[in-house]
C-alpha cells in the first residue's frame, strides 16, 4: 500500500496556510508532521483523510494498481475523542467497531493494551482526561484499518501511557500498517524501527511549506 500527496495546498478561513507540499509513504512506514501552532498540521491531516478538500493538489492511496478510498482505509484520531459521554466505554468502542468493520482485537483486549482493564462498564464521561484519550487510542485497535492518521495523539497522556502508545504504533508498523501523526512533542518513533526492513520514520516540518516561506 502506498499513500502519495502531490502539490497540496490548504487554507483556513479563506487564507492559504501552506502550499507545494508533497510526500509519499508506504507499507510499514510513518510520517511525523511537526511545526508551530497555526502552521496547518491539523488541516493537512484532515485533507489527507478526506474531511477537508485541498485548495490544490491531490491525495492518492493505492494498493498495487488499485486506487483505494482513504476514508475507507484509515482511522482518524483528532483533537476530540469522538465518544458519547453518557454511553459506557464498551458501548462507545462497540459502536466504532461495528461502524468501521474489520474487527481486530476484542474490546477487553484493546483496553488491556492501553492499561484500562476493568473500565468497560463506566460511562465515558466519568473518566479522566488521560483515560478518555486512552479509550480513543483503543478505538484504533478494535477494528483494523491499515492507515492511522492521528492528531496530537498523546495529548493528556502521562509518560507511561506515551511509551505504551509508542509501542502500539511500532507494532502497527511491524504489521505493515502506516501512520501519519501530527505532534509538537517526540512520539518515541524516531530511531525505534530499523530502516533495513519495512519500518521507516520520516518527518515533515510544516514551516517549510508556509506561504510566507515560499513567497
From Swiss-Prot:
Annotated Pfam families: ABC_tran
Higher taxonomy: Bacteria, Pseudomonadati, Pseudomonadota, Alphaproteobacteria, Hyphomicrobiales
Gene name as annotated: ccmA
One GO-annotated biological process of the protein: cytochrome complex assembly
Binding site for ATP: 35-42
Protein name from the UniProt record: Cytochrome c biogenesis ATP-binding export protein CcmA
Domain ABC transporter: 3-215
GO MF annotation list: ABC-type heme transporter activity; ATP binding; ATP hydrolysis activity
Spans through the membrane: none
Catalytic activity line of the entry: heme b(in) + ATP + H2O = heme b(out) + ADP + phosphate + H(+)
Record key words, sorted: ATP-binding, Cell inner membrane, Cell membrane, Cytochrome c-type biogenesis, Membrane, Nucleotide-binding, Translocase, Transport
